[in-house]
């Protein structure tokens, strides 16, 4: 008799209802619940799957390189980055008839093509690639790497090459390996690539495998390194008149601290970026030698956590209970806790990437490709919200499956659970506070509608303006730190050798560094904060109530996602941890919408040299509806109509699709 799906659960396989299919799909990746699963086998399966994941990533990036090399216009774009639209790939089967084929035959292409708004052209150009041959080589290299990863995944499932459970539980060795080996050495390697390949390329010099060993990146070679005269590497940087990809105005420096942006490319100086990666490498390689492993020297994570509490007699002495005692084993024995921490950290980093990619662009000319800037910001913020929601989902699963009350008695984790009502009620209060203050947008809408705009509530974000002023923004008239030439900060910065451009960048008005903010920004800030805090409230409540609540004290016995109306008692609909995650995703998407709309309109006003429109219209609802949404979507809605279609047609469909969802 043929084995029915799912093979991993005999109970489900014998279920005569459609639950067999739906529960089978839902639990396919829930390895720890599969029949016959041991803890060691669980770790081995997940470890091997990481190699598969890496293989997919390398295959995908290889495909990007291959299709641009084959069907793109990289060489033409390199010749004129500001006036050539980069092609991602051809469209094999353009729909919507002849009009669509004509509309999508763009950027001097001979057939229908998609334009690249991912920024990959800018990245490849910045790191030293110049021809389609370079892209093909990169593609082949990544394809080989993908094959190696697949082999490594298969190999680590073979009995002789399966790591033991003790190997997986060796947290200090793993931490050292990740800090020094992955972060440290990869940062050092990247600094090396920038210094040896990218910086020479930006100065019109091609470095490849043929001349790599015979072309020193600096005329002084390694002598200054070994003699300790490192400042030589910062001397003679590129001038403000440097023309990227040529020797005109180029210097010889490889590691600088210039600050600000290259005037032509509007991106950070490559020599600053190389310096940053070298510094990161040094810090992480040192950090990766801090923890006690085979040699019996260094820190013990367990001891650090055990003693991490305020001593008696100090201000917080005794107030924090057992502190972090017990956390080492709790975290080390729970994959869900580890995954939750990893997702939370990655979520924060992804949001930071979104913020930094536009405010401090690293790639040549990307700041002048406005659609790409918008696409990358939206992409990274949406990725960030999903990662953050996932962090709380796995935090809730940890509380249901892995939390041991006795092992965490009176420590920080136990105490969080014990006073969860206070945490939840404070989050609720903060959300209400932010919501009521956001209603100023509605008040302003009413008074503008009744032709009394002077009655609007318009508050300047003085504290944020003060922070910007302290960093060097002179517009607001504060006399503090870097805007005050006589302050200690200004005097100290004058002593840093060489030219510096950070104050020029902060005060330029045409980039996105320290955007000028006013009452509209202040109101939107509170609206976005409302969305973030409400999302957090739902996620935190779902996780902290996952084990049990007043309504259902024994909730942990029913798992993470028990059915609506649940185990034979009424009123359990919408109270599983799964339900709170589901609701939080709605709020997270809502918040990401507000956030990206704000970012987009703010930047449209800068790019169109019309900041007055944002400043005047962003303080009331109709301003947003009329001057942002309607004004900027009219063209899109006409992507297709009875008279034909244009290249926005596909996005017009997406516009409809998004609203139908």
Swiss-Prot record:
Organism per entry: Prochlorothrix hollandica
Record EC number: 1.97.1.12
GO biological process, one term: photosynthesis
Cofactor binding remark: PSI electron transfer chain: 5 chlorophyll a, 1 chlorophyll a', 2 phylloquinones and 3 4Fe-4S clusters. PSI core antenna: 90 chlorophyll a, 22 carotenoids, 3 phospholipids and 1 galactolipid. P700 is a chlorophyll a/chlorophyll a' dimer, A0 is one or more chlorophyll a, A1 is one or both phylloquinones and FX is a shared 4Fe-4S iron-sulfur center.
Name this polypeptide is given: Photosystem I P700 chlorophyll a apoprotein A2
Catalytic activity annotation: reduced [plastocyanin] + hnu + oxidized [2Fe-2S]-[ferredoxin] = oxidized [plastocyanin] + reduced [2Fe-2S]-[ferredoxin]
Localization terms from the record: Cellular thylakoid membrane
Disulfide bonds: none
GO cellular component term, pick one: photosystem I
GO molecular function, a single term: oxidoreductase activity
Protein residues bound to chlorophyll a: 659
């Amino acid at each position: 008799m043929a084995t029915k799906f799912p093979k991993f659960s005999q109970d489900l396989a014998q279920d005569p209802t459609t639950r067999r299919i739906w529960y089978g799909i839902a639990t396919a990746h829930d390895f720890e619940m599969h029949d016959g699963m041991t803890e060691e086998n669980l770790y081995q399966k997940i470890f091997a799957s990481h190699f598969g994941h890496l293989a997919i990533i390398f295959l995908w990036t290889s495909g990007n390189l291959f299709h641009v090399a084959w069907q793109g216009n990289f060489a033409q774009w390199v010749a004129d980055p500001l006036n050539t639209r980069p092609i991602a790939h051809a469209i094999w089967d353009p729909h919507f008839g002849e009009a669509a084929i004509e509309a999508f035959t763009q950027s001097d292409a001979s057939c229908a093509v998609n334009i690249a708004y991912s920024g990959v052209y800018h990245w490849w150009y910045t790191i030293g690639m110049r021809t389609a041959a370079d892209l093909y080589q990169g593609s082949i290299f990544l394809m080989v790497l993908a094959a190696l990863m697949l082999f490594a995944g298969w190999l680590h499932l073979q009995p002789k090459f399966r790591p033991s459970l003790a190997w997986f539980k060796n947290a200090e060795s793993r931490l050292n390996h990740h800090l020094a080996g992955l972060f440290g050495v990869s940062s050092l390697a990247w600094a090396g690539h920038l210094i040896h390949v990218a910086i020479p390329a930006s100065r019109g010099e091609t470095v490849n495998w043929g001349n790599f060993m015979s072309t020193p990146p600096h005329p002084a070679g390694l002598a200054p390194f070994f003699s300790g005269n490192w400042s030589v590497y910062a001397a003679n940087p590129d001038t403000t008149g440097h023309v990227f990809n040529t020797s005109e105005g180029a210097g010889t420096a490889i590691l600088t601290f210039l600050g600000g942006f290259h005037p032509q490319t509007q991106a950070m100086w490559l020599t600053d970026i190389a310096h940053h990666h070298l510094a990161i490498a040094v810090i992480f390689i040192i950090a990766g030698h801090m923890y006690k492993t085979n040699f019996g020297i260094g820190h013990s994570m367990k001891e650090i956590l055990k003693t991490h509490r305020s001593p008696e007699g100090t201000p917080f002495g005794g107030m924090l209970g057992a502190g972090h005692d017990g956390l080492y084993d709790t975290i080390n024995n729970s994959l869900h806790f580890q995954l939750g921490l990893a997702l939370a950290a990655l979520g924060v980093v992804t949001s930071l990437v979104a913020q930094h990619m536009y405010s401090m662009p690293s790639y040549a000319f990307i700041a002048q490709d406005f659609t790409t800037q918008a696409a990358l910001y939206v992409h990274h913020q949406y990725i960030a919200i999903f990662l953050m929601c996932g962090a709380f989902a796995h935090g809730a699963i940890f509380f249901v499956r892995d939390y041991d009350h006795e092992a965490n008695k009176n420590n920080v984790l136990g105490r969080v659970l014990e006073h969860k009502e206070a945490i939840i009620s404070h989050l609720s209060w903060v959300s209400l506070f932010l919501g009521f203050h956001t209603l100023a947008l509605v008040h302003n809408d009413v008074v503008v509608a009744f032709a009394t705009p002077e009655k609007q509530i318009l508050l300047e974000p003085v504290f944020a303006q003060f922070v910007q002023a302290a960093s060097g923004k002179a517009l607001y008239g504060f006399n503090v730190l870097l805007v005050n030439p006589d302050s200690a900060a200004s005097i100290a910065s004058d002593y840093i050798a060489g030219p510096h451009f950070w104050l020029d960048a902060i005060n330029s008005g045409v980039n996105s560094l320290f955007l000028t903010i006013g009452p509209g920004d202040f109101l939107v800030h509170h609206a976005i904060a409302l969305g973030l805090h409400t999302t957090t409230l739902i996620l935190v409540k779902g996780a902290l109530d996952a084990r049990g609540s007043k309504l259902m004290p024994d909730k942990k016995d029913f798992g993470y996602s028990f059915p609506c109306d649940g185990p034979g008692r009424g009123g359990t609909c919408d109270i599983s941890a799964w339900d709170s995650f589901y609701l939080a995703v709605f709020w997270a998407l809502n918040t990401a919408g507000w956030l990206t709309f704000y970012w987009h309109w703010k930047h449209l006003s800068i790019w169109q040299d019309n900041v007055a429109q944002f400043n005047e219209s962003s303080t009331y609802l109709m301003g947003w509806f009329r001057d942002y949404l309607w004004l900027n979507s009219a063209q899109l809605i006409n992507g297709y109509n009875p008279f034909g279609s244009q290249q926005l047609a596909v996005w017009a469909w997406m516009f409809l699709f998004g609203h139908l969802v």
